[in-house]
Amino acid sequence: MKTFNIKSPDQAIRQALIDRIDNLAKPEGSLGMLEELALQIGLIQQTLSPRLRNPHNIIFAADHGIADEGVSFSPKEVTWQVINNFLGGGAGINFLCRQHGFELVLVDGGIDFDFPEGLDIIDRKVRKGTRNYLYEAALTGEEMEQAVTAGAEVVSDCHHRGCNVVSFGEMGVANTSTSSMWMSFLTGIDLKDCVGAGSGLDSEGVRHKYNILKQAKENYKGNGSTEDVITYFGGLEMLMAVGGMLQAAELGMLIIVDGFIMTNCLLAASQFYPEVCDYAVFGHCGDESGHARLLEYMKAKPLLNLGLRLGEGSGAVCSYPIIVSAVSMINEMHTFAQAAVTKYF
């Protein structure tokens, strides 16, 4: 797999950041997670005056062979149909990006559809959907590497345009199934606790989904390494997000993590480079049943809990104003000395 140069942020500036935050005109710790965010972002950017520039939400999209087994509420063609809605500006993520000042980037990583030329979508299609991992490996090693590299290159392009904060979204019918497989293999959590309703399955649908994934897990004869798992049970859009997250960390960008699927992508990325988590903020806890368990496993503190299960980066983008508030706090609040206020604690 492509190699990255990721290091934890230098801690030499930590005490100066803490002193700056603690000397703002407020009781120490009274702004809670805003103070934690300001410290984290200051460490990432290595400055007492961090700035957020040109935020991007990148949506990687691809199809999944496992969708043929009826594990999703939606038929496979919904993937390309939703992309058309993104392109038309009428989807949930479109209004959120407009509201919060994000540039929306769409990437075809492996949709089983041929879009006409001239659309505002980046073509990095590795293949038209993955193979069905109930019966065979979803991807070859070469295809996995191609996807990771493509995701990294998309993020590099965003960085070159002045972006230093990025969120990731996805579109791909049945990708909650693939996420459940990653979660179970990479955490050791029982598969049953990793499988949920996805885009809207009823209890019978969830039972069928679990049985299919359980059989796929039993059929798997690989070595169980992270690289083997994310290849055999691969999702092209998910692997591109893995590469994108790792590249963002290498470039010192702030990563806003979305829901269940993107949290699994960070989990996979962290298996190779644990330091990637130092650059990540968890936007929200989604409504997919496995997400809360996964966040707990990763010792993550999500900023929001709104019952979202849309994907697309929606929860990450919704959380952005909180992140902006943290940066505004450290840059705009007066210290006790500036405010001529006695330090009262």
From Swiss-Prot:
Gene that encodes it: cobT
Entry-linked Gene3D superfamilies: 1.10.1610.10, 3.40.50.10210
Signal sequence, start to end: none
Active site feature: 312
Pathway in which this enzyme or protein is active: Nucleoside biosynthesis; alpha-ribazole biosynthesis; alpha-ribazole from 5,6-dimethylbenzimidazole: step 1/2
Family: Belongs to the CobT family.
The keyword Transferase is assigned to this record: yes
Keyword annotations of the record: Cobalamin biosynthesis, Glycosyltransferase, Transferase
Highest taxon listed in the record's lineage: Bacteria
Catalysed reaction equations from the record: 5,6-dimethylbenzimidazole + nicotinate beta-D-ribonucleotide = alpha-ribazole 5'-phosphate + nicotinate + H(+)
Gene Ontology MF annotations: nicotinate-nucleotide-dimethylbenzimidazole phosphoribosyltransferase activity
Transferase among keywords: yes
Official protein name in the record: Nicotinate-nucleotide--dimethylbenzimidazole phosphoribosyltransferase
Annotated coiled-coil segments of the chain: none
Species name: Porphyromonas gingivalis (strain ATCC 33277 / DSM 20709 / CIP 103683 / JCM 12257 / NCTC 11834 / 2561)
A Pfam short name: DBI_PRT
InterPro entries according to UniProt: Nict_dMeBzImd_PRibTrfase (IPR003200), Nict_dMeBzImd_PRibTrfase_bact (IPR017846), Nict_dMeBzImd_PRibTrfase_N (IPR023195), Nict_dMeBzImd_PRibTrfase_sf (IPR036087)
Role summary: Catalyzes the synthesis of alpha-ribazole-5'-phosphate from nicotinate mononucleotide (NAMN) and 5,6-dimethylbenzimidazole (DMB).
EC id: 2.4.2.21
GO-annotated biological processes: cobalamin biosynthetic process
